[in-house]
UniProtKB/Swiss-Prot annotation:
One of its GO terms (molecular function) is nucleic acid binding. It comes from the Bacteria. CDD domains: PoNe_Nuclease. This is UPF0102 protein CA_C1763. Gene3D superfamilies: 3.40.1350.10. PANTHER family: UPF0102 PROTEIN YRAN. The lineage of its organism: Bacteria, Bacillati, Bacillota, Clostridia, Eubacteriales. It comes from Clostridium acetobutylicum (strain ATCC 824 / DSM 792 / JCM 1419 / IAM 19013 / LMG 5710 / NBRC 13948 / NRRL B-527 / VKM B-1787 / 2291 / W). InterPro entries: Restrct_endonuc-II-like, tRNA_endonuc-like_dom_sf, UPF0102_YraN-like. Belongs to the UPF0102 family. Pfam families: UPF0102.
Length: 122
């Protein structure tokens, strides 16, 4: 089961990256990790740096993917983002936290993607 979930996560992150690029974003970092946590995608669009959490599922039977981004997860993303901002001296930008949901199709390589801009604030 773990391998299947990893495959869904990898596929979802790639789909999210393609979507963001097509929407005019520049990808600054994927899977940024530090001692505070991880951010799936860090992207730039105009004067915004966005910290994107990607949630992928094989179905929405047990709830929407974004429902897995609980307060604790949001706090980890926020702290990791603060570290990234400080380490890169990105003081002249606005910042935003987005979520991308990806529901994968078992039968083929298709998927449904939902971009939730400004999904949360802390």
């Amino acid at each position: 089961m773990h391998r299947l979930n990893k495959k869904a996560g990898d596929y979802g992150e790639k789909a999210a990256e393609i979507y963001l690029k097509k929407s005019g974003y520049t990808i600054l970092n994927r899977n940024f990790r530090c001692f505070l946590g991880e951010v799936d995608i860090i992207a730039k669009n105009k004067d915004y740096i966005t910290f994107v959490e990607v949630k992928s599922r094989w179905s929405d039977t047990y709830g929407l993917p974004c429902e897995a981004v609980n307060y604790r997860k949001k706090l980890k993303i926020y702290r990791t983002a603060k570290y990234y901002i400080a380490s890169k001296s990105l003081i002249n930008y606005n910042f935003r936290f987005d979520v991308i949901e990806v529901i994968l199709n078992h039968q083929n390589d298709s998927y449904d993607l939902k971009f939730i801009e400004n999904a949360f604030q802390i």
